[in-house]
Amino acid sequence: MSSDYFPSYDGKLPKVKKHHRPANPESSLHLKHRETARIFLLNPSGELFLIKTHWDPGTGLPPRWLTPGGGVDKGETILEAAVRELFEETGLKVKPEALGELELSLPFKMEWVSGHYETGIAHFYRFVVTADFKMDDSNWTQDEKRDVIEYRWWNIADLLQSGEIVGPPGLAEYLENHFSGR
């Protein structure tokens, strides 16, 4: 992505301000729609596993924390993508039924400084690991090896008070409302 693209967050997420708005709103262009499958990965203490990543090179944006997950491939169900992504990003092998029912589908819109925008829906499942879970990053893609800064378990209250950017837009509010007291 070109360095003139900067997203704007909604809600309680920290704001990354646009440098300008297009003079003609009709000139906005919808770049793409992206479906993602993500997992609320919890440990027995109720802490949430998150991965801190860079944006695409050249954006100049600050890093953000994401749950394990990624894009749904063509011909793949959301559940199949969640199982695949969980293995690729954490090394954790689970059967689809272990993820249970879809917990959340969070639509989002990323607006860029050029006036262009992307839309998407992040679909979330929940899984609780056993105390002996060990993170395995051996299945990461080259992009993940380049983009991942760190990963860790977060107490939800600490995360929400940290000032860290959590994505996608709207996720911080969901965590605050549905994972309170953890």
PLM regions: where:
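A short coil-to-beta-strand element that immediately follows conserved catalytic motifs
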Residues: 93-104
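A generic structural micro-feature
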Residues: 29-32, 61-64, 115-121, 143-148
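Acidic, metal-coordinating catalytic segment for phosphate/diphosphate chemistry
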Residues: 2-45
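Short, P/G- and charge-enriched loop/turn segments at secondary-structure junctions
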Residues: 20-29, 110-115, 138-140
